[in-house]
């Protein structure tokens, strides 16, 4: 059963992943080429084994064609994710600061470039644990206003909440009404 438009979240997880593809990552090209001029900018030169910075969408496209290896962001390692998880669990008052578009970039890299990542199964598990801890905090925050006002709450965990529960919470605090679209809150 499809939800009415007023109960749809502002952005779907796929739309958030699309937006994250504009962030830059490092790649190690498996080909040689001088600079390439695209609408979004000039990238290159591409000379193996030197790393190049490109938008995530370009890195993913080259990866699918087996033209590069993606260098994972420094925060996408088992040690860093374990530290994020530990800090998130210890901070019961709010949310820990995570890198920009943390969940979206992680998901895309694990889906397309898992062979370039160290211990992808462990990374998936840690990311799931972090997401679950944050979602539990959000659910608890639906009882009070405080958690929802935290600056470090990222879009993806918030957008994955049940739209009906989110609508009920927003209405309770006078932030929206039944005719108000979630996309404009």
From Swiss-Prot:
Which Pfam families does the entry link to?
Answer: PSF2_N, Sld5
Query: Where found, per UniProt?
Result: Nucleus
User: What InterPro entries would the database entry show?
Assistant: GINS_A, GINS_bundle-like_dom_sf, GINS_Psf2, PSF2_N
Q: Which CDD domains match?
A: GINS_A_psf2 (cd11712), GINS_B_Psf2 (cd21694)
Q: Does the keyword Nucleus apply?
A: yes
Report the transmembrane regions from the record. Answer: none
| One cellular-component annotation, GO | chromatin
Q: What are the BP-aspect GO terms?
A: chromosome segregation; double-strand break repair via break-induced replication; nuclear DNA replication
| Keywords for this protein | Chromosome partition, DNA replication, Nucleus
Could you tell me which cysteines form disulfide bridges?
none
Q: Which domain of life is it from?
A: Eukaryota
Give a short account of what the protein does: The GINS complex plays an essential role in the initiation of DNA replication. Has a role in chromosome segregation.
What the record says about family reads: Belongs to the GINS2/PSF2 family.
How is the subunit organization of this protein annotated in UniProt?
Component of the GINS complex which is a heterotetramer of SLD5, PSF1, PSF2 and PSF3.
User: Protein name, please?
Assistant: DNA replication complex GINS protein PSF2
User: What gene, per UniProt, encodes this protein?
Assistant: PSF2
